[in-house]
Amino acid sequence: MNESLLTQFGNSLTRVEKALENLKNGKGVLLVDDENRENEGDLIFPAETITVPQMVMLIRECSGIVCLCLTDKKVKKLGLTQMVHNNTCTYETAFTISIEAKEGVTTGVSAADRVTTILTAVKDDCKPEDLCHPGHVFPLRARAGGVLTRPGHTEGTVDLMRLAGYNPAGILCELTNPDGTMARLPQIINFAKKHNLAVLSIEDIIKYKKITT
């Protein structure tokens, strides 16, 4: 991680605190990982406050693969099986089967329909029969222990939601450049400044958790 580029947003502690303030106000944040890992930045929003305009931003400015990060407990409660039995992807990203709300959507692919699906899934009383499969929202199962166990965007998202006082469920999508390539740290920072978003790294969350928990 090129730490020097992030110092304009403060030190690790300050960056996490700014991100938590944004999230508490229902705004998004940009979470980056190490350049020796995926070297990507994910745009993240709290699941329980996601809006249609925010979903439009995720679809237009990011990869379009909108993911719902959930705890293992929530995944089991919703009856979501893993997408594959043998996960052979490089970072073992834990995709479950995709979901759609059973009611309140049309084809499920519009921004409004995806918001409906997410808000349905994160309700405390949501049951497996309230969802259908496959769908246009892709749940991810976070590992217990968060970023201290796996330094991934999924765990970082769930950790941030907990720290911000939300239920541990968040939305993420990978930021892309206008030409379709993946945004790297310089482009991520420019996007953050343009849209007044906080930027932090997974390493920042690791340091914050070690200090505060």
From Swiss-Prot:
Gene3D superfamilies documented for this protein: DHBP synthase (3.90.870.10)
Enzymatic reactions: D-ribulose 5-phosphate = (2S)-2-hydroxy-3-oxobutyl phosphate + formate + H(+)
EC number: 4.1.99.12
GO annotation, cellular component aspect: cytosol
Residue numbers binding Mg(2+) 2: 38, 153
Keywords: Lyase, Magnesium, Manganese, Metal-binding, Riboflavin biosynthesis
Gene Ontology molecular function, alphabetical: 3,4-dihydroxy-2-butanone-4-phosphate synthase activity; magnesium ion binding; manganese ion binding
Record-marked site positions (Essential for catalytic activity): 136, 174
Family according to the record: Belongs to the DHBP synthase family.
Protein's job: Catalyzes the conversion of D-ribulose 5-phosphate to formate and 3,4-dihydroxy-2-butanone 4-phosphate.
Protein name, entry field: 3,4-dihydroxy-2-butanone 4-phosphate synthase
Organism: Clostridium botulinum (strain Hall / ATCC 3502 / NCTC 13319 / Type A)
Gene expressing this chain: ribB
